[in-house]
């Protein structure tokens, strides 16, 4: 059976930690930030840990990154 391929888009956007959690950028920052609160903009910086259902999907995209 051939090897599974890693989705290159997922490889560029997400990282799996040593404990198995998936880290990715915060969503919802592309446009429309003028109506957001300063707290929302501040909290949306950096990265966040994905929820378990989302992390399971991303781990399926990266079979060798567990």
Swiss-Prot record:
It holds the Pfam family Ribosomal_L35p. Signal peptide: none annotated. One of its GO terms (biological process) is translation. SUPFAM superfamilies: L35p-like. GO terms for molecular function: structural constituent of ribosome. The keyword Transmembrane helix does not apply. Belongs to the bacterial ribosomal protein bL35 family. This is Large ribosomal subunit protein bL35. It comes from Roseobacter denitrificans (strain ATCC 33942 / OCh 114) (Erythrobacter sp. (strain OCh 114)). The lineage of its organism: Bacteria, Pseudomonadati, Pseudomonadota, Alphaproteobacteria, Rhodobacterales.
């Amino acid at each position: 059976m051939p090897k599974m391929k890693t989705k290159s888009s997922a490889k560029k956007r997400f990282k799996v930690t040593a404990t198995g959690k998936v880290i990715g950028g915060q969503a919802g920052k592309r446009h429309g930030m003028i109506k957001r609160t300063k707290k929302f903009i501040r909290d949306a910086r950096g990265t966040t840990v994905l929820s378990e259902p989302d992390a399971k999907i991303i781990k399926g995209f990266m079979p060798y990154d567990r």
